[in-house]
Design a protein with these regions (language model features):
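Terminal, low-structured helical/coil segments at or just beyond the last alpha-helical repeat
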Residues: 1-4, 120, 124-160
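Structural signature of alpha-solenoid helical repeat scaffolds
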Residues: 3-4, 36-37, 70, 106, ...
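Alpha-helical segment of the N-proximal tetratricopeptide repeat
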Residues: 5-41, 47, 54
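Structural signature of tandem alpha-helical TPR/SEL1-like repeats
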Residues: 21-33, 54-67, 89-104, 113, ...
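Short coil turns that delineate tetratricopeptide repeat
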Residues: 39-40, 73, 107-109, 143
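TPR alpha-solenoid repeat register
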Residues: 44-45, 78, 112-114, 148
Protein backbone atom coordinates (compact mmCIF):
# COMPACT_ATOMS: atom_id res chain seq x y z
CA UNK A 1 0.00 0.00 0.00
CA UNK A 2 1.57 3.22 -1.14
CA UNK A 3 1.47 6.57 0.54
CA UNK A 4 -0.78 7.84 -2.27
CA UNK A 5 -3.53 5.38 -1.29
CA UNK A 6 -3.10 6.29 2.37
CA UNK A 7 -3.35 10.00 1.60
CA UNK A 8 -6.39 9.45 -0.61
CA UNK A 9 -8.02 7.33 2.10
CA UNK A 10 -7.31 10.03 4.69
CA UNK A 11 -8.87 12.66 2.43
CA UNK A 12 -11.96 10.52 1.92
CA UNK A 13 -12.19 9.96 5.68
CA UNK A 14 -12.07 13.72 6.31
CA UNK A 15 -14.78 14.33 3.70
CA UNK A 16 -16.87 11.53 5.22
CA UNK A 17 -16.56 13.05 8.67
CA UNK A 18 -17.60 16.47 7.34
CA UNK A 19 -20.64 14.90 5.65
CA UNK A 20 -21.52 13.10 8.86
CA UNK A 21 -21.27 16.28 10.93
CA UNK A 22 -23.53 17.99 8.39
CA UNK A 23 -26.11 15.24 8.87
CA UNK A 24 -25.61 13.67 5.44
CA UNK A 25 -25.20 10.16 6.79
CA UNK A 26 -25.65 8.15 3.59
CA UNK A 27 -23.03 10.28 1.82
CA UNK A 28 -20.73 9.91 4.82
CA UNK A 29 -21.14 6.13 4.83
CA UNK A 30 -20.30 5.92 1.12
CA UNK A 31 -17.13 7.95 1.65
CA UNK A 32 -16.07 5.88 4.68
CA UNK A 33 -16.51 2.71 2.59
CA UNK A 34 -14.34 4.19 -0.18
CA UNK A 35 -11.70 5.19 2.37
CA UNK A 36 -11.70 1.68 3.85
CA UNK A 37 -11.30 0.11 0.40
CA UNK A 38 -8.16 2.17 -0.19
CA UNK A 39 -6.66 1.84 3.28
CA UNK A 40 -8.63 0.23 6.12
CA UNK A 41 -8.17 1.89 9.50
CA UNK A 42 -9.79 1.27 12.86
CA UNK A 43 -11.01 4.86 12.83
CA UNK A 44 -12.74 4.55 9.45
CA UNK A 45 -14.49 1.33 10.46
CA UNK A 46 -15.55 2.86 13.78
CA UNK A 47 -16.89 6.03 12.19
CA UNK A 48 -18.69 4.04 9.50
CA UNK A 49 -20.30 2.13 12.36
CA UNK A 50 -21.29 5.40 13.96
CA UNK A 51 -22.95 6.51 10.70
CA UNK A 52 -24.76 3.16 10.42
CA UNK A 53 -26.01 3.53 14.00
CA UNK A 54 -27.53 6.92 13.23
CA UNK A 55 -29.24 5.34 10.23
CA UNK A 56 -30.76 2.69 12.50
CA UNK A 57 -28.44 -0.05 11.27
CA UNK A 58 -27.14 -1.03 14.70
CA UNK A 59 -26.15 -4.58 13.72
CA UNK A 60 -24.05 -3.15 10.87
CA UNK A 61 -22.55 -0.65 13.30
CA UNK A 62 -21.51 -3.46 15.64
CA UNK A 63 -20.03 -5.40 12.71
CA UNK A 64 -17.92 -2.37 11.72
CA UNK A 65 -16.66 -2.06 15.29
CA UNK A 66 -15.54 -5.70 15.20
CA UNK A 67 -13.67 -4.93 11.96
CA UNK A 68 -12.07 -1.89 13.63
CA UNK A 69 -10.87 -4.05 16.52
CA UNK A 70 -9.40 -6.56 14.05
CA UNK A 71 -7.44 -3.74 12.38
CA UNK A 72 -6.22 -2.20 15.66
CA UNK A 73 -7.08 -3.89 18.97
CA UNK A 74 -5.48 -0.99 20.90
CA UNK A 75 -8.04 1.53 19.59
CA UNK A 76 -10.63 1.82 22.37
CA UNK A 77 -13.50 3.62 20.66
CA UNK A 78 -15.05 0.56 18.99
CA UNK A 79 -15.16 -1.30 22.32
CA UNK A 80 -17.14 1.52 23.91
CA UNK A 81 -19.32 1.86 20.83
CA UNK A 82 -20.21 -1.85 20.88
CA UNK A 83 -21.15 -1.44 24.54
CA UNK A 84 -23.28 1.61 23.78
CA UNK A 85 -25.02 -0.13 20.87
CA UNK A 86 -25.77 -3.18 23.03
CA UNK A 87 -27.26 -0.89 25.69
CA UNK A 88 -29.36 0.72 22.97
CA UNK A 89 -30.59 -2.77 22.02
CA UNK A 90 -31.48 -3.53 25.65
CA UNK A 91 -28.63 -6.04 25.98
CA UNK A 92 -27.10 -4.42 29.05
CA UNK A 93 -25.28 -7.46 30.44
CA UNK A 94 -23.54 -8.09 27.11
CA UNK A 95 -22.33 -4.47 27.09
CA UNK A 96 -20.27 -4.72 30.29
CA UNK A 97 -17.19 -6.59 29.00
CA UNK A 98 -16.97 -4.27 25.99
CA UNK A 99 -17.09 -1.18 28.20
CA UNK A 100 -14.41 -2.62 30.48
CA UNK A 101 -12.18 -3.28 27.45
CA UNK A 102 -12.65 0.35 26.40
CA UNK A 103 -11.55 1.49 29.86
CA UNK A 104 -8.24 -0.33 29.54
CA UNK A 105 -7.56 0.35 25.86
CA UNK A 106 -4.15 1.78 25.09
CA UNK A 107 -5.43 4.34 22.60
CA UNK A 108 -8.77 5.84 23.53
CA UNK A 109 -10.30 9.28 23.90
CA UNK A 110 -12.57 10.45 25.45
CA UNK A 111 -11.81 8.19 28.40
CA UNK A 112 -14.94 9.02 30.39
CA UNK A 113 -17.50 7.53 27.97
CA UNK A 114 -17.19 3.87 29.01
CA UNK A 115 -17.63 4.89 32.66
CA UNK A 116 -20.75 6.87 31.79
CA UNK A 117 -22.10 3.95 29.77
CA UNK A 118 -21.32 1.49 32.55
CA UNK A 119 -23.21 3.78 34.94
CA UNK A 120 -26.19 3.46 32.57
CA UNK A 121 -25.97 -0.34 32.90
CA UNK A 122 -25.87 -0.10 36.70
CA UNK A 123 -28.82 2.30 36.72
CA UNK A 124 -30.76 -0.15 34.55
CA UNK A 125 -29.92 -2.91 37.05
CA UNK A 126 -30.98 -0.60 39.93
CA UNK A 127 -27.49 -0.98 41.41
CA UNK A 128 -27.30 2.53 42.80
CA UNK A 129 -23.91 2.18 44.55
CA UNK A 130 -22.10 1.00 41.43
CA UNK A 131 -23.91 3.58 39.31
CA UNK A 132 -22.79 6.33 41.69
CA UNK A 133 -19.22 5.00 41.60
CA UNK A 134 -19.10 5.08 37.78
CA UNK A 135 -20.72 8.52 37.61
CA UNK A 136 -18.16 9.89 40.07
CA UNK A 137 -15.36 8.25 38.05
CA UNK A 138 -16.77 9.86 34.90
CA UNK A 139 -16.62 13.26 36.58
CA UNK A 140 -13.06 12.67 37.83
CA UNK A 141 -11.99 12.13 34.24
CA UNK A 142 -14.27 14.77 32.67
CA UNK A 143 -15.42 17.30 35.29
CA UNK A 144 -17.54 19.17 32.72
CA UNK A 145 -19.56 16.10 31.65
CA UNK A 146 -23.10 17.44 32.08
CA UNK A 147 -24.92 14.12 31.51
CA UNK A 148 -22.91 12.54 34.36
CA UNK A 149 -23.44 15.54 36.63
CA UNK A 150 -27.20 15.54 35.94
CA UNK A 151 -27.54 11.79 36.44
CA UNK A 152 -25.51 11.86 39.65
CA UNK A 153 -27.72 14.68 40.95
CA UNK A 154 -30.86 12.65 40.18
CA UNK A 155 -29.38 9.57 41.79
CA UNK A 156 -28.34 11.36 44.98
CA UNK A 157 -31.74 13.09 45.20
CA UNK A 158 -33.37 9.65 45.49
CA UNK A 159 -31.62 9.13 48.82
CA UNK A 160 -32.08 12.58 50.40
Amino acid sequence: MGSDEREQAAGLFQRAYAEQMAGRLEAAAELYVKSIRLHPTAEAHTFLGWAWSFLGRVDDAIAECHKAIAVDPDFGNPYNDIGAYLIELGRHDEAVPWLKKAMTAVRYEPRHYPHLNLARVHLHRLDWALAEQELRRTLEIAPDCEPARRELGRLLAKFN
